[in-house]
Amino acid sequence: MVIGGGHAGVEASIVSAKMGAKTHLITLLIQNIALASCNPAVGGLGKGHLVKEIDALGGVMGVITDKCGIQFRILNASKGPAVRGTRAQIDMDRYSIFAKEIALNTPNLTISQESVESLIYEQDSKGRYIVKGVTTNIGKTYFAKKVILTTGTFLRGLVHIGETKLQNGRFGEMSPQNLSNSLQDMGLTLGRLKTGTCARIDGRSIDFSALEIHNGDEKPPHFSYKTINFSPTQLPCFVTYTNENTHKIIRDNFHRAPLFTGQIEGVGPRYCPSIEDKVNRFADKSRHQLFLEPQTQEAVEYYINGLSTSLPIDVQEAVIHSIKGLENAHITRYGYAIEYDYVEPTELYHTLETKKCANLFLAGQINGTTGYEEAAAQGIMAGINATLSLQNKSFTLARNEAYIGVMIDDLVTKGTKEPYRVFTSRAEYRLLLREDNAYLRLGTYAYKFGLIDKVRYTQIMADKTHIEHTINYLQNHHITPSSSNLTMLASLGLPPISDKALLIHIVGREELDCALLRTLLTHLGITDVESMSDLAIEQIFIESKYFDYIQKQKQQIGQMRQMLQVEIPRDFIFDNIPGLSLEVIEKLKKFTPKSLFEANEISGITPASIDVLHLYIHLHHKKKSQILV
């Protein structure tokens, strides 16, 4: 049973059905399945990695985005592949239509339009709650072996537009007010978070001649491995800026802003602040950049990215009309803030099942995250784990395996007091977690769970074999500056060498297109180049270019694995260890882990804390050995 048909709910319900579980999705409005409530875009820095990982695991977000995207770009294209991010503007109407089409045509999956009012549960002999099903607003009762909550911003949702407050989970949609009570009654810790959205304006009322144009890439990237012959029709976005007059209007109305009057209690997203928050916090800035993003292929409405606000409607109108190009803009939908309940994610196992309530899984904004991609990634993991748990199995991803693993580990071990979003900087091993190798990292899991077919799996394994054999050859063979080799390098436009060099350093020296790289590899003695896919060739180049750094990160992972095997002495005292917070010390004393591996599994114990513990265990052993001497 999946509750909520947003991005998390869609991935959770489809993946569980594909794995063979009879699945039922309950959502408030079927026509709003996977609706893009905020900006009409998917991907970006860090977020693009999540979409690629979802796709590699057999999810649908990448497929849908490629089908309905109206602009595609690579962000950070001038930087290394580890920090690049694919981003697409989407037709938000078609996105929802395609998601609904996939869901309604997925075997084992049924859907109904209702609102869940409460959870059905009981307690076992040890006092742990066991969730059995749900009751809905139309008097129906559903029993299920597993329940996944993907409620988004709908748990006691409260919309703010100036002084006006509406009990909505999204503007115009009702908000379940009682479901949170079930969670609290079972002992789960709830908090309040806040997010917001921008006004939308009629494209016919915009003066585009006054704006900067922002086009997609000439060679548009795509998200899904299923996408072939990709040539989408792309629409431009447009750039404009706030100005001093805009800021004066906002400052003059701080006293009417729910964010500052105390009307809003929830904590908002740090990396997506409202315009009133930006004007207040960055008083020295004379302008803020805004992007006008088309919401559909027809470009009827535009989303003003960067102008999230909950100011009163008359102030919103004055603010928008003070901006260049928008002097006569007609507002079709006003911006608003929304507060909602979330469950403190330290209440979860890494499988996304709640610790206090058996059979209950949570995914998406209910876990304190923000963003479609973060929600979808949790949804697919919750769906996989809920299904596997029927066989007493589970599936988790480590921090060195996927950004999904980084995100879930952050949430479960550290918790969050503000909406959490993924960044590449959150990953310790980001050179290993690139967008381009997501299918290699996760494809085997997808095949194991029946989420990709044998043909796709065979392709993945062939690529893996080609890459491993080629990299192994390149790192163990050299090239000399002979006349024939210098001639060969010159013919490919490559600089000469003066000394003997490893082949892997030659391959990774210069940016080459796929055809030239194939020619170079053939000259260097690789015999099966023609049978390699373009993706494998790309991987060989990237692995060669960053070979030394990648090897270093792999060594760090090996060292971490060894470190986690270290046992904690029985007489080891956690008190007063420099570098450990009081909270960490209290948890270590409470759970008394026998090893660093067990310590690492405790919620709130960070990798940095493990490093400190490892050091002081070493010093403890050293001190004892000195005493014995």
Swiss-Prot record:
Q: Which residues bind FAD?
A: G4, G5, G6, H7, A8, G9
Give the matching InterPro entries.
FAD/NAD-bd_sf, GIDA_C_N, MnmG, MnmG-rel, MnmG-rel_CS, MnmG_C, MnmG_C_subdom, MnmG_C_subdom_sf
- Enumerate the transmembrane spans: none
* Pfam entry (one): SAM_GIDA_C
One Gene Ontology molecular-function label: flavin adenine dinucleotide binding
Q: Which UniProt keywords apply?
A: Cytoplasm, FAD, Flavoprotein, NAD, tRNA processing
The cross-references to SUPFAM superfamilies, in alphabetical order and at most eight, read: FAD/NAD(P)-binding domain
Q: Which GO terms describe its cellular component?
A: cytosol
Q: Where does NAD(+) bind?
A: 268-282
Query: What's any GO biological process attached to this entry?
Result: tRNA wobble uridine modification
Q: PROSITE patterns from the xrefs?
A: GIDA_1, GIDA_2
Q: Subcellular localization, per the record?
A: Cytoplasm
| Cofactor(s), by name | FAD
Which NCBIfam families does the annotation name? mnmG_gidA
Q: How does it assemble?
A: Homodimer. Heterotetramer of two MnmE and two MnmG subunits.
As for family, the record states: Belongs to the MnmG family.
Q: Which HAMAP family match?
A: MnmG_GidA (MF_00129)
Q: What does this protein do?
A: NAD-binding protein involved in the addition of a carboxymethylaminomethyl (cmnm) group at the wobble position (U34) of certain tRNAs, forming tRNA-cmnm(5)s(2)U34.
Protein name according to UniProt: tRNA uridine 5-carboxymethylaminomethyl modification enzyme MnmG
Specify the species: Helicobacter hepaticus (strain ATCC 51449 / 3B1)
Specify the taxonomic lineage.
Bacteria, Pseudomonadati, Campylobacterota, Epsilonproteobacteria, Campylobacterales
